Amino acid sequence: MNTKLLMIVSAAVLAALGLLASFVPREILIVFGSRAEVLEILLVQVTGALYLGFAMLNWMARGNLIGGIYGRPVAFGNFMHFTVVAFALLKAVIAGPRPPVVVVGATMYGAFCVGFGWVLFTPPHSVARPAE
């Protein structure tokens, strides 16, 4: 699997979600029908900061061999994040009618869960670089 592509795409998605959660938390809460009060806004902003941190981690590790002995923590952290959120979103989808964005999110997180699971539980393959 091309881990560089996986890392770049996941970094872009997490950065977009993190920026949205950091700068428009009230609007996000309103879209999902939640109260837009101080504590809820703060929790969405903190979550946005976490997403931005993961995005930076993935962006900075994009050129490394992910899944090997040194890249395993990055793969495991991503796998854990995407798996837990995928199951939480799947549970919400199964519970009843949800906005389409929740279904799209569950699908997207499920795909990242599978991708990082593949990277984590299969041996890494280094890509031969052309000689300079």
Regions found by a protein language model. Name each.
Residues 4-7, 11-14, 47-51, 75-82, ...:
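Residues within membrane-spanning alpha-helices of integral membrane proteins
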Residues 16-20, 40-63, 76-87:
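Core segments of alpha-helical transmembrane spans in multipass integral membrane proteins
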Residues 32-41, 70-73, 97-108:
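Non-cytosolic membrane-interface motifs at loop->transmembrane helix junctions
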Residues 58-71, 93-94:
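Juxtamembrane helix-break-helix junctions at the cytosolic face
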Residues 111-130:
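Membrane-water interface at the C-terminal end of transmembrane alpha helices
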Residues 3-4, 17-42:
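Membrane-helix boundary elements
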Residues 87-104, 120-122:
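Membrane-helix boundary connector in multi-pass membrane proteins
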Residues 30, 68, 125-132:
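Short, Lys/Arg-enriched, Gly/Pro-containing loop segments at transmembrane-helix junctions
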